[in-house]
Amino acid sequence: MPAENAHIRNFCIIAHIDHGKSTLADRLLDKTGTLTKREAQAQFLDNMAIERERGITIKAQSVRMNYTAKDGKQYVLNLIDTPGHVDFAYEVSRSLAACEGALLVVDATQGVEAQTLSNVYMALDHNLEIIPVINKIDLPSADVDRTRAEIEDVIGIDASVAVPCSAKEGIGIQDILESVVQNVPPPSGSADAPLKALIFDSWYDNYRGVVTLVRVLEGTLKLKQKIKLFSNNKVFEVQELGVFSPFSRPVPQLIAGEVGVLVANVKELQDAKVGDTVTEESRPTAEPFPGFQEVKPMVFSGIFPVDSADYENLRDALAKLVLNDSAFTYEPESSTALGFGFRCGYLGLLHMEIVQERLEREYNLNLITTAPSVVYRITTSKGETLLVDNPAKLPPVQHIEKFEEPILTCHIHVPNDHLGAILKLCQERRGVQKDMKYLGSSGQRVQVTYEMPLAEVVFDFFDKLKSVSRGYASLDYELAGYIESDLARLDILINGDPVDALSVIVHRERAYLRGREVCQKLKEVIPKQMYEVAIQAAIGAKIISRETISAIRKNVLAKCYGGDISRKRKLLEKQKEGKKRMKQVGTVEIPQEAFLAVLKSEQ
């Protein structure tokens, strides 16, 4: 172990959402004197992200803290904050790769949750030293012993060294810092070796171009050095180096084991991808850091401006968003019903919601979003394999040999009392149960493993899961591949014309229900016309559901007081004839509310 980095400790905090990760980070900053009283504010690391209007994939923050331990030595602690949400599992894995240790925060009132587990397993894969921290011990419902037993039973790591603390009250913070110094190993790697650094985060700055956060694994990173990126072999010159403590301050160099900021005149975020390896052009390292992946979107939807005059503004807004979010993709698309817009790809549902919210909030756009769809794999009768993310691009039914959909392995953690409701929900969503085990000695919590189609999880599975379990269930999922399914495209026809924006790919079992629901919804929101309007749901040429909006008509019999029936019939036939002619030339205007109503009913 080189002497120059014996005093460095790189660690991260992993926790389920709401287990107190950000508050704990604040307390560590307070305790080490990194923040002055004036700078101290709640959830400092999170706020920094919002203040810089940094996008959703750019969540890994890093802060350098100086700490004098009880042995009198001065240590440099680099805290790397990781995102907690399952959509960003790849970013979490890159942040973990930049550390040697991890604080595992478990809420003493809740116990071990699903995403805690998935993150712990990821940390163990990276051979990190894990220090369990039991948080929220100040709450009356906290049970430290039970939580300790659960950590040992469920995760299988020794919890006798677990540090009880309350981040809110500031109890036990000193013990955590001591534990980090004693248990987390210092970084290996020599400052004299060829340069090898891992990019674990990047974002776009309007003045400096792309700013990356790097962990130097070997060698030394200096100003004005010529560096090369492994994934695309592009060469750049180092313009700026810095460390966050907690605001960025410049440094002349970063040596092996250190974490810092690198700015090197990179103009596009696509060139500095998370997980890439940086090396020196003149003396490159032999091997890049393993595990680099291109992040691929899993969920797609169309985004259209409500007012077609906003199309240019939407295009500019998306171009700016992509600068800050390399996992987000978009391409132009046009719809006969909604006009011009874009087909966008996201990592998952949370990612989709955040992108849409940012477009509306930051760029003042009024948008319509089509139903989210996933990437289906289709084998045609000619033996070609197609990947389809848009129902409109589906080949005709007679040309489809095999229809496959993406499937997820879902791990759900739930208290025993709510197990029945969760099993019912998973079966409704075409889930297949793979495993079920009781956690801990008390058997109060259950881990259920299901295989479920991504299309079923995409809509509102997470919300439903929370509501049937009163917020106690937690979900973690990963893509398990593709499976053959009996799927079909459901088209909605208005007076015989298909409306492309309302087409969806559904399972045949569900098609009738879904079709009926959409037709009924449209009947409520499409205004009456001067002639009869037929709303139909169809699969291929087969109509499976129909609703009719009756015509607005004048009472032509009002002037006939009594009189012969043939006179009345003549007037009614004449009116009918007129309506028929109207129908031939008339087109139905579908109001914007109709699309919104249907998309809501789908969700």
From Swiss-Prot:
Name of the protein in question: Elongation factor 4
Database matches in SMART domains: EFG_C
NCBIfam families: lepA, small_GTP
Assigned GO CC terms: plasma membrane
EC number: 3.6.5.n1
Record-level GO BP terms: positive regulation of translation
Keyword flag Nucleotidyltransferase: no
Cell inner membrane in keyword set: yes
Record's signal peptide: none
Catalytic activity: GTP + H2O = GDP + phosphate + H(+)
UniProtKB keywords: Cell inner membrane, Cell membrane, GTP-binding, Hydrolase, Membrane, Nucleotide-binding, Protein biosynthesis
Positions of GTP binding: D18, H19, G20, K21, S22, T23, N135, K136, I137, D138
Single annotated GO MF: GTPase activity
Membrane topology: Peripheral membrane protein
Domain (tr-type G): residue spans on this chain: 6-188
Organism the protein comes from: Myxococcus xanthus (strain DK1622)
Primary localization class, coarse: membrane
Function: Required for accurate and efficient protein synthesis under certain stress conditions. May act as a fidelity factor of the translation reaction, by catalyzing a one-codon backward translocation of tRNAs on improperly translocated ribosomes. Back-translocation proceeds from a post-translocation (POST) complex to a pre-translocation (PRE) complex, thus giving elongation factor G a second chance to translocate the tRNAs correctly. Binds to ribosomes in a GTP-dependent manner.
Location of this chain's protein in the cell: Cell inner membrane
SUPFAM superfamilies: EF-G C-terminal domain-like (SSF54980), P-loop containing nucleoside triphosphate hydrolases (SSF52540), Translation proteins (SSF50447)
Enzyme class: hydrolase
Membership in a protein family: Belongs to the TRAFAC class translation factor GTPase superfamily. Classic translation factor GTPase family. LepA subfamily.
